[in-house]
Amino acid sequence: LTLSARLAMLNLAEAQTNDVFDLSSNQPKAMPALDVAVDQLTLSGRDLGRFQLQASNRLARQEGGKVANEWQIEVLRLDMAEASFQATGQWAPVARKAKLPAETAARRTYLDVDLTVRDGGALLTRFGMPGVLRAGSGSLSGQLAWLGAPTRFHTPSLSGALNVDMQKGQFL
């Protein structure tokens, strides 16, 4: 069973955004399969453009032969005039026993990310940082992982590698 939604617009104010992200504080054993497309997503007053998410559940064998649910992120995409972001990945149980923060529920998010920037200055302005960069194009790609749900970016456990290739811009 897949939860599907096609929306022309979705506007989540800051208070609503916090409520959405707090849903993952008591992390479920499985997330629903999703097929969501939003023509215009606004998050905390910031227009993020077109949003698409396709994700499903699967059973996967873990270390020691245990079978557990993994939430597969097949498509995560944001498209705006200045840039396009896409990612694939999974939210899966941590492979080995380790001392983990309580809020992570022994699950880890893994993402392969790709950001194509057409106008870095305009992109930074969109995210509230005007006057930092003029123009600039390029890409950022790599792998990221953190303890906890995809909606709970946990910076203390963040790991990964990113490649940045930017050109034709000027720091102001």
Predicted regions and their residues:
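Intrinsically disordered, low-complexity regions enriched in glycine and serine
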Residues: 63-64
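Internal alpha/beta loop-helix hairpins
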Residues: 58-60
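Small-residue helix/turn framework positions
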Residues: 2-15, 31-47, 52-54, 68-172
